[in-house]
Structures are given as C-alpha cells and as structure tokens.
Amino acid sequence: GHPDKVADQISDALLDEFLAYDKNSKVACETLVTTGQVVLAGEVKSSAYVDVQDVARNVIEKIGYTKSEYQFEAKSCGVFSSIHEQSGDINRGVEREDPYNQGAGDQGMMFGYATNETENYMPLALDLSHSLLWELAEIRKNENDLMPYLRPDAKSQVTIEYDDNGKPLRIDTIVVSTQHDEFITAKGITQEEADLAMQKKIAEDVKSILIPRVKAQYPAHVQALFNDDIIYHVNPTGKFVIGGPHGDTGLTGRKIIVDTYGGKGAHGGGAFSGKDPSKVDRSAAYAARHIAKNLVAAGVADEMLVQVSYAIGVAKPMNIFVNTFGRANVKMTDGEIAEKIWNLF
C-alpha cells in the first residue's frame, strides 16, 4: 500500500491488460497517485483496447484503499489518462521480422544478483523486509481481528550484522512503519497520552504477532538470527494515521532498490513497472538475475553479480561482466565465468 508501490502496481496492471489481448504490445506506462487522484501517462503501441480507469480502480481496491477517510479511495478518486502512441523513431529500432532478434528498447546497464544466504537466492535483509510486509498485508486483509487498526500503507527495513566472510551473524535492527486508524482518546487522558498508548500497542503487536509469524517461515539457521537484542523501531515518528497517496504522492519507478536487491549487488537506474519486454531495463535485468541465480544454485559461487549493457536498437548485449566477490567455488576467473555465460545463455 505504499504510494510508490501503488503506482507501480497500476502501471503493471495496465501492462498486463495490454499484453493479455495483444502479446506484441509495446508499453511504457507511468502512474502518479496523490490525494483523490490518479494520473496515467506514457506511450503505447497496441491493437488492444483497455479501460484504463477500470484497471486502475480495481488495483486500488485490491490493495485496500476502500474508505473515504483515507482521502484516496478506489471508487471516488479521479483517474486522468494522457497515454499516447509510442514514438515511431523508437519502434523502428525495436521491431524485427524475427521476434527473437528484436532490438533493445533503450541503452543502459542492467544487473542481476544472487546469494545462497536464502532459499530463493535473494539477500536475507531484503527477503525479511518483504516477508514482514507480506505478512502484515495478510493480517490486514484476512485476519483483521489480530490487528484491526491497520491501514494499507506500510514500510519495513532490516539491518543484519555479517562476519568478515560475508556470513550473517544476527539481526541487529528491524524497522516497521505501518499506517493505522486513529485511536479513540479515553476520557481523562490527553491526545498525547493516547498517541503514546497507541504506539505502544502497535509495537507490542508487531513483536508478539507479526515477528513470530515471519520467523516461522524461515529455516532454523535463519530463525537463530532472531534474538532478544534486536532493536525495534515501530512507527518511530509516534503516529501514522495520515498515509497512502494522501500523505505522500506516489510515482512509478521510485522503489528500484526495493524491487531488486535491497542495496546489495548494483543497479543501473532503470525501473521495471509498466514496461513490456522490449524495455531492457526490465527484461535484461530479469535475464541477468536468472543467470546469477542459476549459477549460484549450481554451486559455481556463493554470491554473484552479473552485468549486461545494451544500445538502443541492437539485439545483443554489448558486454557481460561477472563479479563473484572472491566467493567462487570453481577454479575459474570471473572473466572465464563471463565467457561461459556468453556461450551458454
């Protein structure tokens, strides 16, 4: 429910709808969400007709913005579209008779990263942060009696201490900021006292309800990283009633680190959401991740970063770069691994 991710989800839903009816659609869709309003913009080349207002409202409703007090509500918000035709100058460099030889939709560098510290080969701190928010959303949508005050907007962050060999030692800090209903002030206490009681209640629920549910999802060696010394920051400003697009304008593509590796590896700067596969910002980053993940899963290295770069209108990448951070398990240099990747993938 974070505003930037609301925008990302709307952009991706529009992309999905175009591709569902025309698999060759070329889409670059941007979304802005703010108080009571959604603005759609971008470039599209497609034979499909999409009711963009309906798609946007369905996404907003599914996320949970369904109450007027949020000042951003699925049925009543305005949806303004300024989507137009894709540039012919770009399209002529992308489309080919052979679809497997289409040109890249833009220039740039893309990175894929993998590590064996989790079962899905994602960095542990990022994976834990995602799990916290997935579980918080699950409680809000399907087990609301556990934390009935939850609203859609939320963020999390996890800090992990590592040893000199890159192995996680313990979880140092967990940050959870979650939007919530206004708590009713009891008679005889001030608003400030009520707010403090509210913050204490939410912090207790995060520690006693949310954390155990997230911890239980992980294998024993990850569970062992949870300890009594973890520093918790739960709604550290003290109050989070005003949130969502009303509290913070959201834009597509502003959470690129959350969407990738949480600061590990590297990033070329291009966002994913709202872009069809001809946009190498997305497809090449996915391909680089696929390569890194499979090589780490195969035991080639404990950790791997794969970088590719493209020129607009050119089908093949200009280069492949590999960094195993000194954690390779084969008698090959990173350059030799890169050469194997070029021949195999």
Features from the language model and the residues they span:
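N-terminal, positively charged regions that mediate nucleic acid binding
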Residues: 2-28, 143
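Conserved phosphate/anionic-ligand binding catalytic regions in large, soluble enzymes, centered on
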Residues: 2-7, 103-118, 241-266, 270
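A short glycine-rich, hydrophobically flanked beta-strand micro-motif that places a catalytic Asp/Glu
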Residues: 27-29, 154-160, 230-234, 301-311
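Short, charge-patterned binding micro-sites
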Residues: 28-46, 312-316
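Internal helix-turn-beta structural module
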Residues: 34, 303, 309-345
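Glycine-rich, mobile lid/loop segments that gate access to catalytic sites or pores
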Residues: 36, 54, 58-242
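C-terminal catalytic subdomain
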Residues: 254-256, 261-305, 316-323, 327
